[in-house]
């Protein structure tokens, strides 16, 4: 096996299909399967671009592919086992085509490393999230019959070593502005799989944003494991996320900006103000709190209290009263009592969420919480999850029902399942269905909401 760094010198799954960048003799087929967060979606796009320069054209199914790449997530329990199960399902394809190349990327690749190849010898390549710019060099080794492994945290900026993206775009795009996390929440593997917080330069981000707009993008979502910790070099100084958003808002043709995911402790005054004074910044915010009990928040190493979080939400809503708030919650964290869980329910009642995601705690190897006593039983955690989800679903339903009769601006992205139907996103990130022509794709149109459904809204063009 070759470790490339030593020889080179240089969120549910989403399947992504891209039009490849221009390259001669595109004869090889690449299938990418993406698990986990939006950043993995962005990373998959860039990996496909990097391999496009090696003659790979992306396809929508693994059958008939010359290379299959699994871009993995390590946040939830059994993520590694799910990956191994998927690799097992690929065995018949390798048996049918011995020349098929199989690679594993992402956070499970970072965490498991060489163990992946030991357990599944059919894997040719393992690459971490900080080194996928080295994929072309790794493929040289693979094509020579070697195994290739690279899970370094290199000093060089991977974004400087990737080809310029040339794929045709839809009207929305992700743009990674920051990677890694320094918060070290007791339950989280991100600091170990993504590394320390690193911000990209403002100049390069502005250039990439302009390029996206030139290729048809009207809405950009800025990504980071802790995106509001962004502090990138710009104009001889340092830009925070608010400055970056305001400067991007000046780009002609960029109508909408979002960002995710944030930590409450990095919600600076200027970023709060931007929610009120920057119309291009959409009234949607994903701001996880994880728990409502101060005891559990301290055990999680969140470094804020429930009251701190509630005051912060009040300030943001003062700046943007129509804000659609989203959050994350973990139930069954070690040491959580029924009283602690009730504090979480109380916080949800106090704050009110338009959307939220809740999970049972799952011990991640190598994290402080995994070694703690007081683990909550599976039955109790499941019961708490059901009760929390019932409350959050009630709030989401009420928020969606309140949209009926209102007019919203929808950026249309794609046709719906039914003929003559188009689907887009409102300012509040609601999925909105209308009857309309395909020419709506990429356009922003006013829609009056007529009906609220489980996870979407329907309306009519105004």
From Swiss-Prot:
Cofactor binding note of this UniProt entry: Binds 2 [4Fe-4S] clusters. One cluster is coordinated with 3 cysteines and an exchangeable S-adenosyl-L-methionine.
Residues bound to [4Fe-4S] cluster 1: 37, 73, 107
Highest taxon above the source species: Bacteria
Enzyme class, broadest EC rank: transferase
InterPro entries, A to Z: Elp3/MiaA/NifB-like_rSAM, Methylthiotransferase, Methylthiotransferase_CS, Methylthiotransferase_N, Methylthiotransferase_N_sf, MiaB_methiolase, rSAM, rSAM_horseshoe
Locations listed in the record: Cytoplasm
Enzyme Commission number, as recorded: 2.8.4.3
One function term, GO molecular function aspect: 4 iron, 4 sulfur cluster binding
Cofactor dependence: [4Fe-4S] cluster
One Pfam family per UniProt: TRAM
Limits of the TRAM domain: 401-462
SUPFAM superfamilies: Radical SAM enzymes (SSF102114)
Catalytic activity as recorded in UniProt: N(6)-dimethylallyladenosine(37) in tRNA + (sulfur carrier)-SH + AH2 + 2 S-adenosyl-L-methionine = 2-methylsulfanyl-N(6)-dimethylallyladenosine(37) in tRNA + (sulfur carrier)-H + 5'-deoxyadenosine + L-methionine + A + S-adenosyl-L-homocysteine + 2 H(+)
Binding of [4Fe-4S] cluster 2, residues: 181, 185, 188
Residue stretches making up the Radical SAM core domain: 167-398
Keywords, sorted A to Z: 4Fe-4S, Cytoplasm, Iron, Iron-sulfur, Metal-binding, S-adenosyl-L-methionine, Transferase, tRNA processing
Annotated MTTase N-terminal domain residues: 28-144
A GO CC term attached to the entry: cytosol
Entry keyword annotation includes Cytoplasm: yes
The protein's role, per its UniProt record: Catalyzes the methylthiolation of N6-(dimethylallyl)adenosine (i(6)A), leading to the formation of 2-methylthio-N6-(dimethylallyl)adenosine (ms(2)i(6)A) at position 37 in tRNAs that read codons beginning with uridine.
Subunit comment: Monomer.
HAMAP family: tRNA_metthiotr_MiaB
Family: Belongs to the methylthiotransferase family. MiaB subfamily.
PANTHER family listed in its UniProt record: CDK5 REGULATORY SUBUNIT-ASSOCIATED PROTEIN 1, MITOCHONDRIAL TRNA METHYLTHIOTRANSFERASE CDK5RAP1
The protein's name: tRNA-2-methylthio-N(6)-dimethylallyladenosine synthase
Naturally occurring in which organism (per UniProt): Jannaschia sp. (strain CCS1)
């Amino acid at each position: 096996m070759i470790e490339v760094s030593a020889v080179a010198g240089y969120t549910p799954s989403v399947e992504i299909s891209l039009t490849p960048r221009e390259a001669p003799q595109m004869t090889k087929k690449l299938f990418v399967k993406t698990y986990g967060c939006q950043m993995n979606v962005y990373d998959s796009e860039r990996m496909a671009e990097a391999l496009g320069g090696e003659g790979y054209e992306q396809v929508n199914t693994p059958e008939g592919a010359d290379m299959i790449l699994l871009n993995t997530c390590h946040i939830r329990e059994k993520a590694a086992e799910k990956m191994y199960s998927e690799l097992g399902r690929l065995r018949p394809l390798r048996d049918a085509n011995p020349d098929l190349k199989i690679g594993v990327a992402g956070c499970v690749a970072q965490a498991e490393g060489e163990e992946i190849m030991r357990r599944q010898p059919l894997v040719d390549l393992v690459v971490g999230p900080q080194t996928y710019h080295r994929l072309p060099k790794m493929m040289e080794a693979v094509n020579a019959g070697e195994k290739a492994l690279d899970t370094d945290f290199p000093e060089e900026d991977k974004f400087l070593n990737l080809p310029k993206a040339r794929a045709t775009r839809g009207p929305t795009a992700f743009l990674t502005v920051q990677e890694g996390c320094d918060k070290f929440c007791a339950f989280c593997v991100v600091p170990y799989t993504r590394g320390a917080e690193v911000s990209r330069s403002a100049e390069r981000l502005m250039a990439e944003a302009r390029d996206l707009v030139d290729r048809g993008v009207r809405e950009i979502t800025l990504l980071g494991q802790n995106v509001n910790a962004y502090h990138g070099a710009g104009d001889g100084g340092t830009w925070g996320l608010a400055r970056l958003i305001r400067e991007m808002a000046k780009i002609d043709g960029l109508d909408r900006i979002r960002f995710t995911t944030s930590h409450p402790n990095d919600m600076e005054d200027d970023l709060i103000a931007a929610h009120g004074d920057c119309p291009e910044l959409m009234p949607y915010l994903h701001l996880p709190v994880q728990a409502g009990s101060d005891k559990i928040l301290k055990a999680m190493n969140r470094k804020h209290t429930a009251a701190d979080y509630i005051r912060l939400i009040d300030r943001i809503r003062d700046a943007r009263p129509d804000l659609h708030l989203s959050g994350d919650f973990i139930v069954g964290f070690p040491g959580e009592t029924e009283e602690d869980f009730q504090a979480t329910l109380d916080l949800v009642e106090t704050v009110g969420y338009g959307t939220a995601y809740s999970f049972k705690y799952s011990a991640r190897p190598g994290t402080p919480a995994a070694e703690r006593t007081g683990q909550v039983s599976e039955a109790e955690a499941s019961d708490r999850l059901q009760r929390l989800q019932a409350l959050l679903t009630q709030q989401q339903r009420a928020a969606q029902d309140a949209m009926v009769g209102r007019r919203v601006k929808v950026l249309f992205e794609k046709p719906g399942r039914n003929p003559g139907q188009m689907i887009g996103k409102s300012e509040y990130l609601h999925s909105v269905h209308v009857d309309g022509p395909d020419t709506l794709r990429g356009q922003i149109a006013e829609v009056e909401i007529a009906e609220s459904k489980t996870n979407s809204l329907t309306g009519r063009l105004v």
